[in-house]
């Protein structure tokens, strides 16, 4: 990943006297206010330099005029404090919430297209300290180091432990400087909620405000929200409570599919950046990845590509993201000493769906036995049941059911449904 790849953001909730926010350590809770739109971005520069291009109006109106994150991805100890202070100060003057991306962890992207970062963890901590000085106590939402927790395949056990310690220290340092800190949760098609909860716990999410998901990715907001609820439940079961989610919606308004698909014309920008999510578990929808900046597949990572931007700025693809939703309800149909039988009803929303997937969390030592009407997988305490070949496609408002036998105490789980 690179400044604009699938990684995360440092959302900076700035404050100024008499404005929307106050300085000092940001308290836990939902965010309010409008995000800061930086005037000098690659998209804005391209628009200014190409007034007569047929693509300019769409890129200007739908992308350049929207707030997106400012990435801190160049490791330079001589300039980073001034860069942060200037950006935070401009946002504070405007009375807006700035969004930053801290992307400087050593061995970032596991040496992939967005490789780079600090030379070692000691230098990284110095870099973080300078960023904290740049914040200067001004309330700042920080989404810390995209992919740093979800992507660990290139690290040894000792290196993972050292990275976790560095992230934990960074979170505490930035929080003490006024930061509202979010850690990397990957996305809904990556690690299970149970696995990601274990990783977040090891990286110190107890001392952070929450987690972010879908950075530089294309998964639907509905899928990410369902994943977030499961992750919050998994954290709660580990005694880590009060955490909330931020979702990158910059490019999730159309097709998902293969991540490394810069030329996928079915992809679209998603929900505009906002803190008004209508969901107590979700603090914000943010454009962490600036639309139009490449991932390092077909084009150089981080480079602005007008063709990509114009495609993303097009009309929502068919079907749009918010169609094809589903809901799930649970009931216990029978119970006995040491076990019970449950049934889940899946209902399609206002549009047809091609398939569905229901997820819930086991409690009290429960385990799943036989399942009928669906295909079950378990990961730790998380159960996921997907449709069979014959009951996945549902008309608007139509229903399907599956049942299961389980051992353990009877409970009424919170079941979530996402369309496939």
Predicted regions and their residues:
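Active-site cleft segment of glycoside hydrolase catalytic domains centered on the general acid/base Glu
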Residues: 114-138, 146-178, 193-197
């Amino acid at each position: 990943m690179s400044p604009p790849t699938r990684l995360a953001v440092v959302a900076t909730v700035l404050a100024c006297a008499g404005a929307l926010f106050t300085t000092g350590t940001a308290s836990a809770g939902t965010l309010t206010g409008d995000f800061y739109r930086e005037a000098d971005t690659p998209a804005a520069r391209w628009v200014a330099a190409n007034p007569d291009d047929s693509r300019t109006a769409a890129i200007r109106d739908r992308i350049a005029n929207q707030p997106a994150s400012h990435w801190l991805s160049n490791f330079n100890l001589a300039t980073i404090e001034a860069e942060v202070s200037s950006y935070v100060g401009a946002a504070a003057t405007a009375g807006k919430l700035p969004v930053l991306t801290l992307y400087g962890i050593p061995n970032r992207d596991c040496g992939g297209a967005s490789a780079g970062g600090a030379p070692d963890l000691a230098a990284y901590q110095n870099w973080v300290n300078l960023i904290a000085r740049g914040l200067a106590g001004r309330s700042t939402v920080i989404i810390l180091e995209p992919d740093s927790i979800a992507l660990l395949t290139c690290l040894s056990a000792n290196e993972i432990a050292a990275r976790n310690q560095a992230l934990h220290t960074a979170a505490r340092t930035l929080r003490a400087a006024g930061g509202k800190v979010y850690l990397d949760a990957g996305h809904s098609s990556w690690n299970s909620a149970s696995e990601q909860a274990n990783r977040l716990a090891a990286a110190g999410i107890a001392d952070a405000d929450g987690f972010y998901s879908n950075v530089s990715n294309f998964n639907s907001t509905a899928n990410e929200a369902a994943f977030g609820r499961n992750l919050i439940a998994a954290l709660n079961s580990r005694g880590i409570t009060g955490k909330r989610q931020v979702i990158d919606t910059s490019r999730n308004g159309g097709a998902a599919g293969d991540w490394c698909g810069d030329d996928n014309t079915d992809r679209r920008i998603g929900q505009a950046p906002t803190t008004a999510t209508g969901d107590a578990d979700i603090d914000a929808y943010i454009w962490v990845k600036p639309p139009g900046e490449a991932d390092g597949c077909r084009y150089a990572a981080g480079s602005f590509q007008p063709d990509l931007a114009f495609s993303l700025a097009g009309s929502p693809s068919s079907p749009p993201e918010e169609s094809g939703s589903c809901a799930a309800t649970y009931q216990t149909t029978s119970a006995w000493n040491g076990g019970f039988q449950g049934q889940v009803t899946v209902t399609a929303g206002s549009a047809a769906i091609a398939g569905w997937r229901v997820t819930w969390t086991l409690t009290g030592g429960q385990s799943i036995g036989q399942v009928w009407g669906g295909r079950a997988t378990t990961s730790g305490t998380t159960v996921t049941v997907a449709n069979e070949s014959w009951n996945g496609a549902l008309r608007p408002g139509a229903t399907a059911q599956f049942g299961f036998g389980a051992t353990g105490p009877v409970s009424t789980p919170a079941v979530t449904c996402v369309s496939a």
